[in-house]
Design a protein with these regions (language model features):
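Short, flexible, solvent-exposed loop/turn segments with mixed acidic/basic and small polar residues
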Residues: 82-83, 191-198, 308-310, 405-409
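M16 family metallopeptidases and their MPP-like homologs
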Residues: 19, 25-35, 63-118, 155-177, ...
Length: 426
């Protein structure tokens, strides 16, 4: 069975990925910019996408730009940021109604692609730099976004684990950059960082919906004029592994302790044993039938929540849990016991089958939305590999108990981080 028919084409420095499907009533445009994660650039890269959405060369006023979105039947536009291992990804999303369902047959797809290209490639400028007013306003908003991580103790404890575990590795940088670096950014600095990204980033455009493939290719050639560039090969992230696991304890005025434990998996998205790692994580802490959920949360009642997730491009497995401060040692012990049980193969064939079924359902649910489908396909583009959904699911299905035990033996405990509460906020 073929789940997705993805057509790829090169247009200068951009790779277009067109998925023709009648599943959605809208057409989804997703534009991705990928570059190495660096301290010098991460904060500027977190800022300029939001400045770009404030105005274009032809519609420099934000109000005029938003009015135009409304003219295009309420077209929605957004920008966000993610990390894929030691690389920083900027995403622009634009969703437009499918013109086939409109009475007046406005050429919305072409207008949508033209608008996206203007937002990314033709910003509003003043004296060869971004507009100072927009930069000032978006700097304030970026500071608020960075501060929000510190105020949300679940996100903060995960950030602290990564900072301790990946000290002196680019992955330790937060996707939104550094609070103290925001203030010093000038409109000129920001514009230079933006120009570098346009020149050098890996650029991918996803067009998903009931579209005419040739029409899309022609529009991309017309509106997205970029120079060809040599893509840097995808490389395994550097890791400064320590000889012995470390423990880090912070104290803050919170009621609920946050226990986060980081492991190095030594397996990433392009490795042959990656499917086995996915099943390992599902059995260990990824789902509601996993060991962490059943034994730490349900049976021992030691955690308000307990789960694990894999960072596919960096090679990390991270456990996140919320516990009473007095239960710290007991919780660490029982989590370690669940990990040992996984390494020892203490799980049944039924457990494996259930986990595979949940992973498959999760993938199918993900690709059932245009947003999720673009993200799933982008995993391959960012790693510069071809793994069709059918093969990905087949690889999961083929995983054996021995494969799971073997991948588990490569996983090493690295850092235990505890945000110790002293009462106060949760």
């Amino acid at each position: 069975m073929t789940y997705v028919n993805e057509m790829k084409s090169k247009h200068g420095g951009i790779t277009a990925h067109i998925v023709k499907t009648e599943k959605f009533k809208t057409v989804s445009l997703t534009f991705k910019m990928l570059a190495p994660l660096t301290k010098e650039l991460v904060t500027k890269r977190a800022l300029f996408p939001h400045v770009l959405l404030r105005g274009t060369e032809s519609r420099p006023k934000t109000a005029d730009l938003r009015s135009y979105f409304d003219e295009l039947y309420g077209t929605s536009v957004s920008a966000d940021l993610t990390k894929k291992g030691e690389r920083h990804v900027i995403t622009f999303r634009l969703e437009i109604p499918n013109e086939k369902y409109l009475k007046d047959r406005t050429p919305l797809l072409e207008k949508g692609l033209q608008l996206l290209s203007e937002l990314v490639f033709s910003p509003a400028l003043e004296n060869g730099a971004f507009l100072p007013l927009y930069v000032t306003q978006e700097k304030r908003t970026l500071k608020q976004r960075i501060q929000a991580v510190y105020d949300d103790k679940m996100r903060y404890s995960n950030l602290r684990l990564v900072q301790e575990m990946c000290k002196s590795e680019p992955y330790a940088l937060h996707v939104n950059g550094e609070f103290d670096d925001v203030e010093h950014i000038t409109p000129q600095d920001l514009y230079e960082a933006y120009q570098k990204a346009i020149r050098e980033d890996q650029l991918d455009l996803y067009v998903i919906g009931d579209v005419d493939t040739d029409q899309v290719k022609t529009a991309v050639d017309t509106y997205f004029k970029t120079e060809e560039r040599e893509l840097k090969p995808f490389e395994r992230s550097a890791a400064n592994e320590q000889p012995d696991p470390k423990e880090v304890i912070d104290e803050e005025d919170v009621k609920q302790g946050k226990l986060n434990i980081g492991f190095r998996t030594n397996t990433t998205y392009t490795d042959p044993d990656y499917p086995a790692l996915q099943v390992f994580n599902g059995l260990f802490g990824g789902f509601s039938h996993s060991k962490l959920f059943i034994n730490v949360r349900e049976k021992a009642s030691l955690a308000y929540y307990a789960a694990s997730r894999v960072e596919s491009f960096k090679g990390l497995l991270m456990v996140m849990s919320g516990i009473e401060v007095k239960n710290y040692k007991q919780a660490v012990t029982i989590i370690e016991e669940q990990f040992q049980a996984m390494q020892n193969g203490d799980f049944s064939e039924d457990d494996i089958a259930q986990t595979k079924a949940v992973i498959k359902n999760q993938v199918l649910e993900t690709i059932d939305t245009a947003y999720g489908l673009a993200e799933f396909l982008y995993q391959q583009a960012s790693a510069q590999v071809e793994i069709p959904i059918e093969r990905f699911l087949d690889n999961i299905e083929k995983v054996t108990k021995e494969d799971i035990i073997n991948v588990g033996k490569n996983i090493k405990l690295d850092t235990t981080y505890f945000l110790k509460g002293t009462g106060g906020a949760s």
